[in-house]
């Protein structure tokens, strides 16, 4: 087997650039979580920062606990969407393959 260290370093650098780009895309994304059929919405960034909360006026006369539950559900919905849109382990395997690195399928990465 012929081992070319410079080629491996180039491939690793390419993969690192792709991962950095994916991380920047995640940080720049915004998702909207909702609950109560859209009566409560939460806009969240890929860094899990809540940018806005919108509550339909029809809920303003509701019980405080109901409103709190709807807000919590909307935040949880937004968190789930950020996680679904984040760079997953399978995306890292694809980046590695694009860089010419064949990772074993059993390797999972703990970061997103």
UniProtKB/Swiss-Prot annotation:
Function summary: Binds to DNA and alters its conformation. May be involved in regulation of gene expression, nucleoid organization and DNA protection.
Q: Where in the cell is it found?
A: Cytoplasm, Nucleoid
The similarity annotation says: Belongs to the YbaB/EbfC family.
Return any one Pfam family short name.
Answer: YbaB_DNA_bd
Example GO CC term: the record gives: cytosol
TM regions (residue ranges): none
One Gene Ontology MF term: DNA binding
Query: Which stretches does the entry tag as region Disordered?
Result: 1-27
Residue spans making up a coiled coil are: none
Location, primary (coarse class): cytoplasm
Q: Which organism is it from?
A: Francisella tularensis subsp. novicida (strain U112)
Which InterPro entries does the UniProt record give?
YbaB-like_sf, YbaB/EbfC
Superkingdom, natural source = Bacteria
Composition skew (Basic and acidic residues), residue ranges? 17-27
Q: Which UniProt keywords apply?
A: Cytoplasm, DNA-binding
Q: How does it assemble?
A: Homodimer.
Q: What is this protein called?
A: Nucleoid-associated protein FTN_1196
């Amino acid at each position: 087997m012929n081992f070319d260290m410079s080629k491996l370093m180039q491939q690793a650098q390419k993969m690192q650039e792709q991962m950095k780009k994916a991380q920047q895309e995640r940080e720049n994304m915004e998702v909207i979580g909702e609950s109560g059929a859209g009566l409560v919405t939460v806009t969240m960034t890929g860094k899990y920062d809540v940018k806005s909360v919108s509550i339909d006026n029809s809920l303003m006369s509701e019980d405080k606990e109901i409103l709190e539950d709807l807000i919590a559900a909307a935040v949880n919905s937004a968190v789930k969407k950020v996680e679904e849109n984040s760079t997953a382990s399978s995306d890292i395997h694809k980046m590695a393959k694009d860089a010419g690195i064949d990772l074993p399928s059993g390797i999972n990465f703990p970061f997103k």
